Amino acid sequence: MSSVKVAVRVRPFNQREISNTSKCVLQVNGNTTTINGHSINKENFSFNFDHSYWSFARNDPHFITQKQVYEELGVEMLEHAFEGYNVCIFAYGQTGSGKSYTMMGKANDPDEMGIIPRLCNDLFARIDNNNDKDVQYSVEVSYMEIYCERVKDLLNPNSGGNLRVREHPLLGPYVDDLTKMAVCSYHDICNLMDEGNKARTVAATNMNSTSSRSHAVFTIVLTQKRHCADSNLDTEKHSKISLVDLAGSERANSTGAEGQRLKEGANINKSLTTLGLVISKLAEESTKKKKSNKGVIPYRDSVLTWLLRENLGGNSKTAMLAALSPADINFDETLSTLRYADRAKQIVCQAVVNEDPNAKLIRELNEEVIKLRHILKDKGIDVTDVQETPGKHKKGPKLPAHVHEQLEKLQESEKLMAEIGKTWEQKLIHTEEIRKQREEELRDMGLACAEDGTTLGVFSPKKLPHLVNLNEDPLMSECLIYYLKEGVTSVGRPEAEHRPDILLSGEAILELHCEFINEDGNVTLTMKPNASCYINGKQVTTPTVLHTGSRVILGEHHVFRYNDPQEARQSRHNLAAIAEQPIDWKYAQQELLDKQGIDLKADMEKKMLEMESQYRREKVELEQKMYHQTREYESMIENLQKQVDLAQSYISGGGSIWEGERMLTSSLLEFPEELKWTSDQKRVVLKAAIKWRYHQFTSVRDDLWGNAIFVKEANAISVELKKKVQFQFALLTDTMYSPLPPDLLPPGEDLTLRPYPKTVVAIQVQDLKNGATHYWSIEKLKQRLEAMRDMYETDAEMSPADGDPMMDALMGTDPFYDRFPWFRMVGRAFVYLNNLLHNVPLIHKVAVVNEKGEVKGYLKVAIEPVQKDEVINQKKGVRQTAKLHFRKEDFLKSHKNGETSDSDALAFPEHMQEEVEFCFRVVVLQAIDVADTYSDVFCQFNFLHRHDEAFSTEPMKNSKSPLTFEHTQNLHIKMSKTFLHYLHHFPIIFEVFGHFQPKSEQFNFERQNSALGRRLSTKLTFQQPSLVISTPVKSKKANAPIQNNNASVKSKHDLLVWFEICELANNGEYVPTIVDHAQGLPTHGIFLLHQGIQRRIKITICHEKGELKWKDCQELVVGRIRAGPEWAGGDDVDVLSLGLFPGTFMEFSMDDRTFFQFEAAWDSSLHNSPLLNRVSNYGDQIYMTLSAYMELDGCAQPAVVTKDLCLLIYARDSKISAASRFCRSLVGGISKSPEMNRVPGVYQLCLKDGSDSGSPGAIRRQRRVLDTSSAYVRGEENLGQWRPRGDSLIFEHQWELEKLTRLQQVERVRLFLRLRDRLKGKKNKGEARTPVSPCDPVCAIPESIKLDEKDKGIVGKVLGLIRRKIPMNKDPPTGNKAQELSDESGSNSITSPVSDKSLIKSSRSSDLLCRQKSKSDQNLASNDDIVDNLGGMKRSLSGSRILQLNILVPEVLEERVGVVVSKKGYMNFLEEKTQGWTRRWVIVRRPYILLFRDDRDLVIRGIINLANARIEHSEDQQAMVKVPNTFSVCTNQRGFLMQMMPGDEMYDWLYAINPLMAGQMKLHGNQNGTTLKSPTSSSSIAAS
């Protein structure tokens, strides 16, 4: 038994104590240490210790150095360790008292080394000086820290942050999975100690700049193995040296600890307090005389005391070193340390020599294992597969708690036995594996470790040849550089039997793929059998010497470049030549494909064509199938409806309900038999159905009447702004001479499926300033009209000096102008290729006709077959050659019932053979009688199916007539049924273009005769780009809303919508991002976002209480990311549907309006848009469109709220500077209030009657379209006699179509006449009989037809209708008088087809030109569909519905509040639903009154729609409310009493709100009791 040896050491003053002019309060006299408290009015205390070290001043003769401390404490403890005892040295004291300095010191300075380095040095010095060969020494070390009551392994980088502390009945407390390193020298210990010290937790406090924030325990296990030659047995002695560096106790007010430092200090004080309690308890136990009643010692209260249990009163020789601060400011801490040390002297330890503990432990552990196995076996548990790691058992039935505890003890014992039984060599191998693991982690971090283990860096090859990986995907690159060492470097897969040097993966890589042999400075590639290897794109099978810069491809995807530094230095000129083109992965792959003769582009194009063909074919099949099913279901519904109507009529006529139900039940089970129609009847019915299905007379008239007001308003604004642009209606029909452009067609309409041409109502835009004519759709006019209105509103506020007058036209922001092409089309002509069927050349002179049916000239074209043996002589002009491809799916659409087309029955002529190439030429000879107003005339031609670049001639100056082109185009085609079909039915299209240069007299004459031209001027103003109201973004979930502009409106509601974008803040909440309102854009603000932060979009809908009931938001979609305000159109490919949170209704105490708010999570990276992913550049703005599909109670479809938002992306960590925030606040752009960080939007919700919706035909039958051409438009008086065209335009266009039809017929007849004459001349030469026509007639014409009485009656009626003249509308509602048409044209409508009767009976290809556009092989393409429709009509007739459901259809329109401010200022409000007056800032922008909180408020808080409001002002009203200067505004939902502020004029406010009422009041002298309601006309004018 021995007591704990205690020593104290007094350190010098530190810098903090010197700066505080502290006094020394400690004195050391021998082994007595006295603390003097008189200087600070406290008592003196003296203590006796085993050693008292005075290290206060180096010049003091009693100064104790580091060496002396070690010689008196460390040497003795090291001697005990060699004797076989467990020893422990731990330092105790407050923070900054010198504990770490005494224990560790400075390892690099021999004089300043602490106890631990000196002890380790002497340990190996004694081991090295051992001369006894029978004794072997082994040393293991472990290093851990206790930080915040958690144990951390400082030597193993892969260990977790918290190791478990366990207790064994034989070994006592130990740390599970603590790394023990085997060391062989003092240098190894120093390295491990340095690694551990780097991982320790230190921090700076006010008392110590490098304060230890954890307890460190450095353990050395010394094993002495002695071999006894007599007994041939090995005995071992184990001793454990525990060197403890405790963290210092501290006070928070002294150290200034906060946050994490304060938490660390609390845990440090907790463990040290527990250590003090343990010392006190052990001292008490040691001084007790009776040992029977042994008290409880709180070892387990702290991890530190639990691990040091053996060193405190256990099996250990323990020394405690108390470090003291001599300063008077640390008097209390020093006195506490002295008292702890004094108590520790009384602790008695029972140290024993640990002789040969392994044998004893192994035996005891083995007995314990056998005992536990028997216990578990008796309980029926199989422990043969017990795992090493405790707690990880195989899945099975849940074990009881005591059984689980015994099983865990068994695992612990087996684990300890395995660890004890490890040999010294195994421990060294384990240490080496951990060292390699550490180097591997460094290598994964991109660092290379040298062999000495000290140098870190990346080494570049200077002499060694190497392979550079060129893979384009970094994740597939394995390694970037492979070094080719001297000798053989093998390449293969990781699973090979002999691991290769270079590991590659992939299907084409063999287990042993190839070898690189580096001998005599040359590298040779040797491949294994069946290995795929390529050098510079060429496959090699024999050993090949590599040269620097060579491209090596192994397998299919592994591409390398071989580099030899020595060879590169010898031939730098070769490298310079190679450097002209970058050698990368793409270069090597392209080189490989070139060497193999693979044209990757051609293969891709071929596959794309096949996929497109398959897609079109499957699409047509699905559409046909869907159409059939739809028609069947509609027919069944109509039949059932008919039966219900019959039953109801029976009941209403007096029949019983029971009989009516019986009739209904029986009739539902019976269907009338279908009528048996003959083939002639089917043909007649089919023709009539097709005609009426595509008849457009009434729909075209409705479009003219309904949109006349828009054309008139556009012209009025054009005159007011002096834009030199005139707008007028125009009818365009899709014919061969006038094909419709895609932008004039309804979206998704396919003209190829129509048997008759399509006629659309367009807007003819005459740009009189540039002499150009454009055609707009009605929708485009409406969009441009919005911008025209904005331009008109802002024109009065802009000065003539605002910008360059031509900037708006050049930028394309002026809504009146479109860009016009340099070349204008003169006209079109068509040439058929029937002469090629007879192998004769033919020269055509065809008319060039424009879309108005006017002949603009003639074109001379030659079509000549080229014979196989013909020698092509080079003539003057241009000669080109091209190869054509004709695909069957471009022309032949199979019928729905699988019927074959007529092209399958066509036979090839003798000079044409299937799948054999056929050659002919097209020669454009001359253009005749082209007007001299066109210069640079050229002609281009193409086939109907080709959408590629057309064949074009060179432009010719129009200086003389005729214009000679002499352009020859040789064409090669592989003969097929498709091309043969084309020769029979389709022509080549010729288009003549020229630069239009009107004569000045002609241009001026046109301007003077124009009703608008007389009022146009040259004044131009610069207009900022306006933002057209966007259409809703297409939803992926909700159905697209069906708009019915003709349905009756049930109610209208004004909506105020706030849009917010919230970003995730540091506190975990979503905060609205800043909005800049100073730009004045139609978006009402710019959101200033940060890059890469989670966001949410918050939308709040506000409106007056009423019948509107919001259910929830079905979907919120965001898309159309763009850099400019206008959306260019196209498919919404970047649309993202956001994840929604449930919507909630919000209530406010002083506001009884309805507030509905919902949020959606928005991840902007999913748009894959560079505009949202990167930081915005200076001056850039990002625009996007969002649409919220809202579900309303009682509505059949969602209401769509659409808004365009403007964004700016800032860096993630950037903040708006104070200067910038101040500058923006001056102009009112940014406010600190979060209520300002939202963007408002004003909308009008119209609820329409859903029963009006139905098929287009039903809508047209139900609606009454009013002629809006007579409606008044502001500025109409400036238009003079101009009026929008009306019904007369339809008849004029009908005559134009008649002209085009006759021109087409004439040209077709001329073709056949030329061909017949040419064939007749050819036959005369051969003395053969000339037939009547070039080919035989399709069918014989009967000489007589017999008719019965019924047929004669029908023929008589038809002849009567033909002879009857249809009366013309002499007085159309609007426009000029219709021209009187001839009797022949009066019977044809816009879509009336031309007669099917052939003009030349003997010709097979005498189809009409208008049918060729629709593909003659699918003449009447929808025959089956219409037959199904007729079948449905035969089965049942539609009846009235039983129940008309009152379903509403919502329509939301964004209202752009005008920029003209009529009046603004403060007003007092008294609402009927609230109490008390409220002061608000009011801005009148007709037709709205905008309400704000004050004049600094940037967000609209409320709106009043003057179009639906009534203004009242009277003296009686003011007398009743007893408040002067008041008037009332009443809406459908609310009434406001508004009072002006002192100093304001009543007339000014009334004039701003209702000018008509103010004018009447002024006229009548302020009559009392005046109550006026705003008329509709004034409201509409104000709104426009």
Curated annotation (Swiss-Prot):
Residues 1460-1558 form the PH domain. Residues 3-347 form the Kinesin motor domain. Residues 183-335 are annotated as: Microtubule-binding. The keyword Transport applies. GO terms for molecular function: ATP binding; ATP hydrolysis activity; microtubule binding; phosphatidylinositol-4,5-bisphosphate binding; phosphatidylinositol-4-phosphate binding; plus-end-directed microtubule motor activity; tau protein binding. It is found in: Cytoplasm, Cytoskeleton; Cell projection, Axon. Interacts with casy-1. This is Kinesin-like protein unc-104. It comes from Caenorhabditis elegans.
